[in-house]
Amino acid sequence: MVLLPPSLPVCQLKVTAPEFPSNFYLDGDHSGFVGIETRQNPHPSASRNPYGHDAGVTDFLSNVSRFQIIESTLREGEQFANAFFDTAKKIEIAKALDDFGVDYIELTSPCASEQSRADCEAICKLGLKAKILTHIRCHMDDARIAVETGVDGVDVVIGTSSYLREHSHGKDMTYIKNAAIEVIEFVKSKGIEIRFSSEDSFRSDLVDLLSIYSAVDKVGVNRVGIADTVGCASPRQVYELVRVLRGVVGCDIETHFHNDTGCAIANAFCALEAGATHIDTSVLGIGERNGITPLGGLMARMMVADREYVKSKYKLEKLKEIEDLVAEAVEVNIPFNNYITGFCAFTHKAGIHAKAILNNPSTYEIINPADFGMSRYVHFASRLTGWNAIKSRAQQLKLEMTDTQYKECTAKIKAMADIRPIAVDDADSIIRAYHRNLKSGENKPLLDLTAEEQAAFAAKEKELLEAQAAGLPV
């Protein structure tokens, strides 16, 4: 039997104009940026990638349209170097994640400390829609404590690679299998959901992995877990392992990917394509070292895979609020290029891009920012701007000119931007002054400039106008 390559369904697919304020790299503030509204373009639905081909067998295995999220900010995220969540903050984060719509919320082991146990019990009493899990070692002492906290499920883990068996717990595979079965049967006897996961799965022997997973599947584990504990796996390795495992076990498959080599999102997506059912995430990807699959990044990827499923299940407009909450709690700034919520995620600057975006946003966007309650921006105050962006901005300022005049005004803005950085206010002043000169027939200066700037501006303006007259792109 030949398994055809997977088809990757794509999503379907609102503008605004910036100058970068001084705090641009600090807090993502858009003050000083001006919105440029474009016509709303229809986003035709597409259930599969038009550039792919029908791959029925792989589609049968794929869970990209029916995945579940195990949100681990309050477990993996608590292992982030900067993290300290008191009880009130944990409850606030748990409620926010529940409101967003995650399927599960995973908490630090109640065995870690007395406060961890008290926090676990407190969150279990909140009555959230999401199932509450706790993460423990594959040991009966931990299991006995975990089942008394009120959790809906227990996530059990033990290292299976030769590295961890030799240098961590010192147990062999026979011990691991027997311990796993004992813990699983005990937890299930309490009517609680249980997952068994190997640790460092991708550096474990495949025969050992399949043997232990098959054994726990037979005793009724709810999920088996694959963990790329050191972030070494590639998407291809993930797909192949999950596909093989899918043929061995009948239970659900959970996956946990660290981001040490930058593959956590791609690995999560490939795992779903191969038949995994659950993905571990954390807000902003926080966790040990480089962290794990970020919730926002996974949402971005899955919106491209099945927009309607994601929109129907998760309150996407809550994403930024959650990320701001966690970022403040762990005292980090949200990166300027963060998936979806980063300052630049939907900012367009190049003239060619701006023209197309103004006509139809899907030309340079695969995700509609409005789906996440975000805005797009066209940055027109730069040497890279194009006359279509200046025309759109002038019309927003209710200043009508001919296309030739818009182009001449654009040349003046580009000339000034070649001399020094310009702000939105500078660009607006040039547009307004140019329009006033047209109406009055005068030739007053467009901006207050030093003598040196005036000379440089005149030279640049002449150069650009000559190039424009010659039909060259400017």
Swiss-Prot record:
Superkingdom field: Eukaryota
Active site: residue positions: H353
E.C. no: 2.3.3.14
InterPro entries per the UniProt record, alphabetical: 2-IPM_HCS-like (IPR050073), AIPM/Hcit_synth_CS (IPR002034), Aldolase_TIM (IPR013785), DRE_TIM_HCS_fun_bact (IPR048253), Homocitrate_synth (IPR011872), LeuA/HCS_post-cat (IPR054691), PYR_CT (IPR000891)
One CC-aspect GO term: mitochondrion
Enzyme class: transferase
UniProt-listed Gene3D superfamilies: 1.10.238.260, Aldolase class I (3.20.20.70)
Pathway as given in its UniProt record: Amino-acid biosynthesis; L-lysine biosynthesis via AAA pathway; L-alpha-aminoadipate from 2-oxoglutarate: step 1/5
PANTHER family named in the record: HOMOCITRATE SYNTHASE, CYTOSOLIC ISOZYME-RELATED (PTHR10277:SF48), HOMOCITRATE SYNTHASE-RELATED (PTHR10277)
Name of the molecule in the record: Homocitrate synthase, mitochondrial
Naturally occurring in which organism (per UniProt): Penicillium rubens (strain ATCC 28089 / DSM 1075 / NRRL 1951 / Wisconsin 54-1255) (Penicillium chrysogenum)
Native organism taxonomy: Eukaryota, Fungi, Dikarya, Ascomycota, Pezizomycotina
Gene from which the chain derives: lys1
